[in-house]
């Protein structure tokens, strides 16, 4: 089963996050085979780290919580909170399959929270989708929202990916492809 784990930074933790980047990557290396998407989020300026999102396959909710709470930056106090949700990979692929490449400052994480459990919308239709899926209850039975990784011309354009659908709230975060870069990735 797949999960979205979004660690959100506490204010002023950027230096700590940068100091722990190698420990973070080493920890994530242990989950590389099951990783669907990963990467840091930033404020509107694109300069200040605000979090770290991971979408990956794990055996059960308990394993997802262990993944979230054993992460080195979490253990060191860099994060203010963590969101752990079951995830349905509606695109059926990983971020590395995205034809638009991994470079660019025009990538975003968009999370739409549903108005009432069970009113699930359709998957947005766009060649700019890097990742997309339903956020679900722990038992996987109830739709709670939608998470999208998208290439867009700006924050407003990213928000439009979920426009016209029924959401109580939509949050948009600048996002970059994460993980170690190998020679063939640039």
What are these model-derived regions, one by one?
Residues 1-186:
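Conserved, structured core segments of small domains
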């Amino acid at each position: 089963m797949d999960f979205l784990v979004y660690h959100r930074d506490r204010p002023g933790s950027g230096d700590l996050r940068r100091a722990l980047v190698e420990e973070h990557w080493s920890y994530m290396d242990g989950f590389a085979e099951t990783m669907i998407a990963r990467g840091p989020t930033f404020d509107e300026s694109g300069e200040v780290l605000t979090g770290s999102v991971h979408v990956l396959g794990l055996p059960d909710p308990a394993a997802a919580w262990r993944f979230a709470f054993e992460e080195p930056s979490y253990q060191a106090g860099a994060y203010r909170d963590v969101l752990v949700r079951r995830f349905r990979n509606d695109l059926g692929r990983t971020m590395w399959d995205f034809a638009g490449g991994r470079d660019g400052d025009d990538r975003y994480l968009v999370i739409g929270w549903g108005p009432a459990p069970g009113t699930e919308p359709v998957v947005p239709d766009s060649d700019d989708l890097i990742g997309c899926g339903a956020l679900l209850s722990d038992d996987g039975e109830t739709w709670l929202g939608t998470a999208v990784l998208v290439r867009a011309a700006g924050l407003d354009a990213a928000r439009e990916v979920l426009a016209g659908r029924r959401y109580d709230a939509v949050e948009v975060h600048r996002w970059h492809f994460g993980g170690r870069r190998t020679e063939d990735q640039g």
